[in-house]
Amino acid sequence: MGNAGPLKLHTITKPGTIPYPPHGSQEFPSGTLSLSEVLTVPSALVTTLSFFLKCAIWPCS
């Protein structure tokens, strides 16, 4: 249980994760995001949700 904290931190900060703050968008003042950047997070969430829903219907091997 001692290394659960560092492992979680490593998982959050590893390359390839969605680069947005976990507790809101305080790092991005309104007006600084382009349309493509705004759409990146919802599309990633939809992809993740559809993957988990597919696994719920057809169990992943």
Curated annotation (Swiss-Prot):
This is Early E3 6.4 kDa protein. Residues 1-25 are annotated as: Disordered. It comes from the Viruses. Keywords: Early protein. The lineage of its organism: Viruses, Varidnaviria, Bamfordvirae, Preplasmiviricota, Tectiliviricetes.
